A protein has these predicted regions:
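Beta-strand-dominated extracellular/periplasmic modules and repeats
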Residues: 25-152
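Bacterial Sec-dependent signal peptides at the C-terminal "C-region" and cleavage site
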Residues: 18-26
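Bacterial N-terminal signal peptides
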Residues: 10-19
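Bacterial N-terminal signal peptides that target proteins for export
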Residues: 2-11
């Protein structure tokens, strides 16, 4: 009986030590909850090194405005409410499930998602834009787009 009690306590402690995360994979993040107002989008892509080869295990921090163009900061975290962090897979791939951000109200700046790439020797800021031309433009096709990043 005593061994059974010890094993039960061990199993319970082991279960409590498992982090409870909403993301199925560290290379995927869900920024906006299902009930967040706005157009749902999925962004997939890869991170490449300056040599053009896939670069894995890069931290991506992303944040953006809501469907009204406002950040509405989460005071408890001191950061944008719609934001999060992921780590790219070994092949550099990542995916972000969120809503399409709106442009800032009364400003002539296209809707965009702020991106920070970090890792050993890496500290790069970028953005995903929803208008214009360039390598990090999100051209939505059926609410999906592909955006790759090249490290500088």
């Amino acid at each position: 009986m005593r061994l059974h009690t010890m094993m039960t306590r061990f199993a319970l402690l082991a279960l409590l030590a498992i982090p409870l995360v909403a993301n199925a994979s560290p290379s995927h993040m869900k920024i906006a909850a299902d009930n967040e107002p706005g157009q749902r989008i999925m962004i997939n892509g890869r991170v490449f090194g300056s040599d053009g080869k896939p670069h894995g295990v890069v931290e991506i921090y992303a944040y953006h405005t809501d469907a009204q163009g406002l950040y509405r900061r989460d005071r408890s975290k001191g950061s944008a409410r719609l934001g999060g962090t992921l780590v790219t897979a070994s092949d550099g791939s990542y995916s972000i499930d969120t809503i399409k951000p709106a442009p800032y109200p009364n400003r002539d700046i296209p809707a965009h998602i702020h991106i920070r790439l970090r890792g050993p020797g890496i500290n790069q800021q970028d953005e995903i834009r929803f208008e214009g031309n360039g390598p990090t433009i999100c051209h939505l096709i059926q609410n999906r787009c592909n955006v790759d990043f090249r490290l500088r």
